[in-house]
From Swiss-Prot:
Protein name listed in UniProt: Elongation factor 1-beta
Function: Promotes the exchange of GDP for GTP in EF-1-alpha/GDP, thus allowing the regeneration of EF-1-alpha/GTP that could then be used to form the ternary complex EF-1-alpha/GTP/AAtRNA.
Family: Belongs to the EF-1-beta/EF-1-delta family.
Keyword terms: Elongation factor, Protein biosynthesis
GO molecular function terms noted in the UniProt entry: translation elongation factor activity
Alphabetized InterPro entries for the sequence: eEF-1beta-like_sf, EF1B_bsu/dsu_GNE, Transl_elong_EF1B/ribsomal_bS6, Transl_elong_EF1B_B_arc
Xref: SUPFAM superfamilies: eEF-1beta-like
The keyword Oxidoreductase is assigned to this record: no
Keyword set includes Cytoplasm: no
Length: 94
């Protein structure tokens, strides 16, 4: 039996501007992640940055695979209104 370990990834998603509709952005992020069958969404919340700009903190569980979080980051960068995606942390789950 092959057991694939999983990784909890904490991402910070920065929008293009503070004028974005954050609820719509979170929904677009959720839809993109759900289209990736290997992702389990653990949580999503807004984090104030400065001058009205907020980051969306996204926590997901993905299989521990070669290439790390690259596919996840690339997929989120495809979402309209997303400017930057940063991996805050990644750790194996038990």
């Amino acid at each position: 039996m092959i057991v694939v370990s999983k990784v909890l990834v904490d991402l910070k998603v920065l929008p293009e501007s503070a004028d974005v509709d954050y609820e719509e952005l979170k929904e677009a992020i959720r839809e993109k992640l759900e289209s990736m069958d290997v992702v389990d969404i653990e949580g999503m919340e807004e984090e104030p940055i400065a001058f009205g700009l907020k980051a969306i903190r996204v926590k997901v569980v993905v299989p521990d695979a070669e290439g790390g979080t690259d596919a996840l980051e690339d997929a989120l960068k495809e979402v309209d209104e997303v400017n930057q995606v940063e991996v805050v942390s990644a750790s194996r789950t038990l």
